[in-house]
């Protein structure tokens, strides 16, 4: 069920270059269950910026009534969000969308988690929940450069973890797809979130396998009303799906990337 609440900022810190970890508390956390879902945050009390910012859930802690969101400062909206201090209130709408299907990974099976840049955060809660279900988790995380790397140790706590950087300044040089091939990583199910070229490469490479992709799209309303985030369905010029309400997670081949 979608709710709305002025959640309280518990803490905020920079964890990598232009990347922030924001912890919020509130009753809305009780409704957050699916890894891969997101929230829509109003970053300022004023009307400018008008639109909310869609930010994925990184961690859900029902006992503490807290959730963690990791985001990257890109423009005016996220710059305003970086100024939030403990005790401040933030207008939050959510949880939104459909997350990663946990049942696709059998207990004792092997799940490969592939993240690129700011697509890494939602995979953390996924890794945690899969590990709790007895799934063997392997993570491949890609970043532009060493300064952008975050949560390596956190993912490593759940299983084998590989880091790739575009410039080779940390971990393995190259793309996440290079790491998968070079390391010969096998899987029963693959979950991924990141830039569209990365998702497209995974879609093409592993078509026909159990692969689930979380799309990152600009959106207006977050609830399927404004049609700002639609993507086409293969084989049709008129059919489409909405990333915010039908997704953001889709099975590989379900939508055109």
From Swiss-Prot:
Residues holding [2Fe-2S] cluster: 221, 226, 229, 244
Protein name: Dihydroorotate dehydrogenase B (NAD(+)), electron transfer subunit
Pathway: Pyrimidine metabolism; UMP biosynthesis via de novo pathway; orotate from (S)-dihydroorotate (NAD(+) route): step 1/1
Task performed by this protein: Responsible for channeling the electrons from the oxidation of dihydroorotate from the FMN redox center in the PyrD type B subunit to the ultimate electron acceptor NAD(+).
Residues binding FAD: 53-56, 70-72, 77-78
Range of residues in the leader sequence: none
GO BP: any one term: 'de novo' UMP biosynthetic process
NCBIfam families: PRK00054.1-2, PRK00054.1-4
GO molecular function: 2 iron, 2 sulfur cluster binding; electron transfer activity; flavin adenine dinucleotide binding; metal ion binding; oxidoreductase activity
A Pfam family per the record: DHODB_Fe-S_bind
Residues covered by the FAD-binding FR-type domain: 2-102
Cofactor note: Binds 1 [2Fe-2S] cluster per subunit.
UniProt key word Flavoprotein: yes
Keywords: 2Fe-2S, Electron transport, FAD, Flavoprotein, Iron, Iron-sulfur, Metal-binding, Pyrimidine biosynthesis, Transport
Similarity comment: Belongs to the PyrK family.
Subunit structure: Heterotetramer of 2 PyrK and 2 PyrD type B subunits.
Cofactors (names): [2Fe-2S] cluster; FAD
Organism: Geobacillus thermodenitrificans (strain NG80-2)
